[in-house]
Each structure stands twice: as structure tokens, then as C-alpha cells.
């Protein structure tokens, strides 16, 4: 009985390790999909396909491309958000100034006793 239980435990542990290994291999395959085509062979040597070598440019593999871009330029979404906030803030300020000017001019016109200078209503009156 004990030997059957030991076998069952061993089988379960073997299945678990096999599943873990398969998961690791799948993760490695997914991680390897984004790797560059030209991989370093030795220090400074890169595989160049045969044929017309002048047209084929060997590109150095970029390791941790996204990390490099984020640290060199800053996070693009955050930068765009800051620029948009600055632009929107400036537009709101300009609109508020225009609104204040219009409100002020209307309130001054209503308060002032002088007739409006640009109102030529009398000139175009057709009544005799």
C-alpha cells in the first residue's frame, strides 16, 4: 500500500515538474518572438545572409528597447498629457479673458449714461 502511495506521489510530482517546464518553455518562446533577427555570434560578429551583401545592412540588436526608449525620452503618454494640459490651460485662460472683457464692456455700456458711439440708429431711421 505504501509503495502505491509513494508511486502516486512521485507521479504527481513528475507531472507538476513537467507542467512547470512546459510553462517555462512557452514563456521563453513568447519572450523570444520579439528578439532581433541578427543575433551576436562572437564579439562583434553578426550573421549576414549570403547573396547580395551590399544591400543587406546588419543592424545591431537592441536589447531592452522599450526600457531604453522610456528612459531616453520619458514616457510618451505622460509627456503628451503634460503638453495637452498646458495647451488646454492656456486656451481656457484666453477664453476667460475674452469672456471677462465682453462682460465688462456690456456692463460698462449699461451703466454709462453716454450714448454708444458706434450706434448710428438715428441716421437710418425712415420715419418722417
From Swiss-Prot:
GO terms for biological process: cell differentiation; negative regulation of protein ubiquitination; nervous system development; positive regulation of transcription by RNA polymerase II; signal transduction. Pfam families: BEX (PF04538). Phosphorylated. Phosphorylation of Ser-105 protects it from the proteasome. The modification Phosphoserine is found at residue 105. Zn(2+) binds at residue 125. Residues 117-121 are annotated as: His cluster. It is found in: Nucleus; Cytoplasm. It comes from the Eukaryota. Keywords: Cytoplasm, Developmental protein, Differentiation, Metal-binding, Neurogenesis, Nucleus, Phosphoprotein, Ubl conjugation, Zinc. Residues 1-37, 107-128 are annotated as: Disordered. One of its GO terms (molecular function) is metal ion binding. Its main location: nucleus. Residues 115-128 have a biased composition (Basic and acidic residues). GO terms for cellular component: cytoplasm; nucleus; transcription regulator complex. The histidine cluster (His cluster) and Cys-125 mediate zinc-binding. Signaling adapter molecule involved in p75NTR/NGFR signaling. Plays a role in cell cycle progression and neuronal differentiation. Inhibits neuronal differentiation in response to nerve growth factor (NGF). May act as a link between the cell cycle and neurotrophic factor signaling, possibly by functioning as an upstream modulator of receptor signaling, coordinating biological responses to external signals with internal cellular states. Belongs to the BEX family. Interacts with neurotrophin receptor p75NTR/NGFR. Interacts with OMP. This is Protein BEX1.
Amino acid at each position: 500500500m505504501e509503495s502505491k502511495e509513494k508511486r502516486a506521489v512521485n507521479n504527481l510530482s513528475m507531472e507538476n515538474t513537467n507542467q512547470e517546464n512546459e510553462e517555462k518553455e512557452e514563456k521563453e518562446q513568447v519572450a523570444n518572438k520579439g528578439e532581433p533577427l541578427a543575433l551576436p555570434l562572437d564579439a562583434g560578429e553578426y550573421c549576414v545572409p549570403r547573396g547580395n551583401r551590399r544591400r543587406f545592412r546588419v543592424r545591431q540588436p537592441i536589447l531592452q528597447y522599450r526600457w531604453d526608449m522610456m528612459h531616453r525620452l520619458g514616457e510618451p503618454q505622460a509627456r503628451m498629457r503634460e503638453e495637452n494640459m498646458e495647451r488646454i490651460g492656456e486656451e481656457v485662460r484666453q477664453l476667460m479673458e475674452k469672456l471677462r472683457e465682453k462682460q465688462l464692456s456690456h456692463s460698462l455700456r449699461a451703466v454709462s449714461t453716454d450714448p454708444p458711439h458706434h450706434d448710428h440708429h438715428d441716421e437710418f431711421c425712415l420715419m418722417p
